[in-house]
Each structure stands twice: as structure tokens, then as C-alpha cells.
UniProtKB/Swiss-Prot annotation:
EC number: 2.3.1.97
Keyword field: Acyltransferase, Cytoplasm, Membrane, Transferase
Subcellular location per the Swiss-Prot or TrEMBL entry: Cytoplasm; Membrane
Segments for region (Disordered): 1-77
Protein family: Belongs to the NMT family.
The protein's name in its UniProt record: Glycylpeptide N-tetradecanoyltransferase 2
Acidic residues composition bias: residue spans: 15-32
Source organism: Danio rerio
Length: 492
């Protein structure tokens, strides 16, 4: 946002009156940036957090405890009542514990969730044993968009327009999810965005943007796509919320809350009142918590960009040998999925997913969209047995990350495990072939969550555990929490 007019607009306060604003968390806009259906904030594997340097405190001349300074200050400043000082101290302690989004349950219990406390979601400390909506479906839904402050405007993004698609790509590429050390940022390609945002049943007004009125620069975005989701024994028409992004120069200016409220209004107008989403931070209240695992395919590059590090007593050469893969796959009948396979893949997928508590329901149109291979977007391979019968399939999608601040490497090509079904071939053999195929296609790392059956192969195939979780959430629906192996839903 370099232009003068744009900079001026960005300085305007986005604080709206109560009737026109909302927030995922009214205290922390950064938390809002982490609410997404994408693979969380765990872009780096097993990286240690940078230690904050602390200045050493000089001992007092009297050899008393370090907090004696505050005691003496109370004596030296009789105009400040002790109660006031204690209030200030408590406020400072509260600030120190609540700065930044909560990464785990312990941090979350100390966090204030002003927005979520008003929303139809379970409280963090609530023990949920029932199933069903938290609020009934609304009958009277606001017809007009929520108001934005002067200088900003709503815009429904037409992703069939190449220029608009490029604008969205640029916004996400420069402002979307980064790892904790600001070394990697997701790099969704324009064609990937069209794939992720235009499945069967998509609606154009669910691609919700915010622009600067003066120069029409895109500075905010949120999306919803329709999905039929099974939650335990209940089938609900929902939306998947994804790609919530606000320009960095507008952070802490209450843009994300308005985006959330507006997409909720637009979804409600279509008669849908439940949503599913994922986040790398802890909000009230996760229905499940999964962990990312990473399998090195190009160890040299991963070490050079500090995505991973050499283990103790391991040289680079030994590490490369450890992760070396065969040059060809081993499963007989393994081939690329084609149009003729859609019907059988749909049947395999539906039967496989029926064992999980949280799962999508996909017909042939959805399977055709999500699984038919597209270069640098989605790869699917099927195993064809005798008589043309399909027995298994594997799939993974492509999501590179921009490597920041590195003189040589600018991008990290990552494969993300999507849906894998096995009936004849052992899962570990299928996934080993998936690693080989990804390596042959030039991927640097293969990522997988520990959901569905994935725990059966992660350690055996030399995946390393990542340093972040991915929480699954339901909006306006309560149900008992579930273990990762009962989650059968993967969001981009």
C-alpha cells in the first residue's frame, strides 16, 4: 500500500458502532488471520522458537529480593495508592499472557475471547455431550451488507476475470499465513484458488472482498464454499470458511470482524446456518486437534532454508541417504486417475469415509472436481486390479510456500496428503509410492495430518512431527470432541 491515497485510507479507524461490527476475537486481529481452512500455521518442521533475550537485573545493594524495587516505589510515591499499583500490575500480567493468539489449550485458558463469548460455539471449558445446533435457524436475516467506514467498499470478486484473480493471488501471497518465525508464507497459485473456491454449487457472492474506495486496491477477503458434512450421525448442509486475509497495514483495525459478519450474513441468506473451518490457533472450541507431520524429499534444500535441521550426530550426507527413495513405484496397476474412474473412486471414497465422525459427502460431481488431476494443483493415482476394478487410490495437492530472506531459494514445493483409500494394497505401500511420485514431480516435502488412518504410516515412512497443531471447528453446532483418527475431512 505505497500510494499516498491508499496510505491515508489505511489510517482510518475501522472501529464501527456495535450494531455494525463483529469479530472472531475482538482483542486480537492476528488471531483472525489464522482462521482458515488451509493447512494451519505449521509451515516449518521442528523449528525451535527464537528465545527472547532478557536483560539481567542488577541485585540491589541491600541484597533484598528483586521485587523490593516495587515495594520501595510504593513508599516513595505515597500519592499512588497501593490498590492502584496492584491494579496496574494485574493489568500488565494480563497483557503479558494475552499478547498474540493462543497456540495451545493452556494459553487459551488465559485468553479473553470477547467475540466468541457472544457466538453460537461451545465455551472452552464446556463439556459437550449432546449433538445439535446451538441456535435455531434465523427467520429474519439482514438484507443489506454491513457498513464499512468511509474510504472502503465491498466487492464481490469475479474469479473468472484474470485480473481479479491475480489481485487475490497477490493479496494472499503478500499477507496470508506465515510460520511463527516469518520465514515461509503460503503461495496459493491463481489456478489453485479457482480449484479451491469454485467447487460444484459455489456462489459468486461468497467470494467477499474489501477494497480501498479511492484506488480500488484489494485489501481484504474471505470465502465460503458449500459442503455436505456428516457430524457423527447427522448430515448437514454447511459451508467451509477459508482464506480470511487482511492486508498487513490494516491489521488491528477491525477489518476481519466485519468480513466474518458479512460472510455469515451472505451464507444465512442461502438458508445455511452451520460452518466448518480450521485454524492454527486455539479458539472456542475445537471439535478436534490434529498435528502436521513432514516427510523430507529434498533434505539438502530443507536444511538450507531452515525448514528442518540436522539431527545430532547426523551429517547432511547421512540425512540424504536416510530419506532416499526408489526411482519407481512398486504397486502393480498404479496409474493416474482419469475421467472414466470417477464413478469407482466415488464409491470407494464414500465407503471409506463412512467410518469417520466428521466427514464430507461427495457425489460424482464433487469427486470429479476435487480429484481429477490438474498440474500443480491436485494429483490422484488409482490402483486398477483385474477386470478394470479399482481397489485403492491416493491423492495429494500442491501448495508451495514462499521462502523469505534466502539468497538462493525462493520457493518450497510442498505436497499435502488429501484422501487415501486402501482395500487391497497395504496403506504403507500406497503412501510409499505417493512419496516416490511426489519426489519424481519435484516436491521438496510431503506433509500429512495425523487424521483418518494416517498414523499407521507416519513414523514407519520417516515422517517427522511438526511444531504446530491444526484445530477443527464447527460454527453453530455442538457435539462431543473426537480424536484425530476419527476426522475424515481435509480442507485446503
Amino acid at each position: 500500500m505505497a500510494e499516498d491515497s491508499e496510505s491515508a485510507a489505511s489510517q482510518q479507524s475501522l472501529e464501527l458502532d456495535d450494531q455494525d461490527t463483529c469479530g472472531i476475537d475482538g482483542d486480537n486481529e492476528e488471531e483472525n488471520e489464522h482462521m482458515q481452512g488451509s493447512p494451519g500455521g505449521d509451515l516449518g518442521a521442528k523449528k525451535k522458537k527464537k528465545k527472547q533475550k532478557r536483560k539481567k537485573e542488577k541485585p540491589s545493594s541491600g541484597g533484598t529480593k528483586s521485587d523490593s524495587a516495587s515495594d520501595s516505589q510504593e513508599i516513595k510515591n505515597p500519592a499512588i495508592p497501593m490498590q492502584k499499583l496492584q491494579d496496574i500490575q494485574r493489568a500488565m500480567e494480563l497483557l503479558s499472557t494475552c499478547q498474540g493468539p493462543a497456540k495451545n489449550i493452556d494459553e487459551a485458558t488465559k485468553h479473553k475471547y470477547q467475540f466468541w463469548d457472544t457466538q453460537p460455539v461451545p465455551k472452552l471449558n464446556e463439556v459437550v455431550t449432546t449433538h445439535g445446533p446451538i441456535e435455531p435457524d434465523k427467520e429474519n436475516i439482514r438484507q443489506e451488507p454491513y457498513s464499512l467506514p468511509q474510504g472502503f467498499m465491498w466487492d464481490t470478486l469475479d474469479l473468472s476475470n484474470a485480473e481479479v484473480l491475480k489481485e487475490l493471488y497477490t493479496l494472499l501471497n503478500e499477507n496470508y499465513v506465515e510460520d511463527d518465525d516469518n520465514m515461509f508464507r503460503f503461495d496459493y497459485s491463481p489456478n489453485f484458488l479457482k480449484w479451491a473456491l469454485r467447487p460444484p454449487g459455489w456462489l459468486p457472492h461468497w467470494h467477499c472482498g474489501v477494497r480501498v474506495s479511492s484506488n480500488k486496491k484489494l485489501v481484504g477477503f474471505i470465502s465460503a464454499i458449500p459442503a455436505d458434512i456428516h457430524i457423527y450421525d447427522t448430515l448437514k448442509r454447511m459451508v467451509e470458511i477459508n482464506f480470511l486475509c487482511v492486508h498487513k497495514k490494516l491489521r488491528s483495525k477491525r477489518v476481519a470482524p466485519v468480513l466474518i459478519r458479512e460472510i455469515t450474513r451472505r451464507v444465512n441468506l442461502e438458508g445455511i446456518f452451520q460452518a466448518v473451518y480450521t485454524a492454527g490457533v486455539v479458539l472456542p472450541k475445537p471439535v478436534s486437534t490434529c498435528r502436521y507431520w513432514h516427510r523430507s524429499l529434498n533434505p539438502r534444500k530443507l536444511v538450507e532454508v531452515k525448514f528442518s535441521h540436522l539431527s545430532r550426530n547426523m551429517t547432511l550426507q547421512r540425512t540424504m541417504k536416510l530419506y532416499r527413495l526408489p526411482d519407481s513405484t512398486r504397486t502393480p496397476g498404479l496409474r493416474t486417475m482419469g475421467d472414466r474412474d470417477v464413478k469407482q473412486v466415488t464409491a470407494l471414497l464414500q465407503k471409506h469415509l463412512s467410518q469417520f465422525h466428521l466427514r464430507p459427502v461427495m457425489g460424482e460431481e464433487e469427486v470429479k472436481h476435487w480429484f481429477l488431476p490438474q498440474e500443480n494443483i491436485i494429483d490422484t493415482f488409482v490402483v486398477e486390479g483385474s477386470g478394470g476394478m479399482l481397489t485403492d487410490f491416493i491423492s495429494f495437492y500442491t501448495l508451495p510456500s514462499t521462502v523469505m530472506h534466502h539468497p538462493l531459494h525462493k520457493s518450497l514445493k510442498a505436497a499435502y496428503s488429501f484422501y487415501n483409500v486402501h482395500t487391497e494394497t497395504p496403506l504403507i505401500d500406497l503412501m510409499n509410492d505417493a512419496l516416490i511420485l511426489a519426489k519424481l514431480k519435484g516436491f521438496d516435502v510431503f506433509n500429512a495430518l495425523d487424521l483418518m488412518d494416517n498414523k499407521n504410516f507416519l513414523e514407519k515412512l520417516k515422517f517427522g512431527i511438526g511444531d504446530g497443531n491444526l484445530q477443527y471447528y464447527l460454527y453453530n453446532w455442538k457435539c462431543p470432541p473426537m480424536d484425530p483418527e476419527k476426522v475424515g475431512l481435509v480442507l485446503q
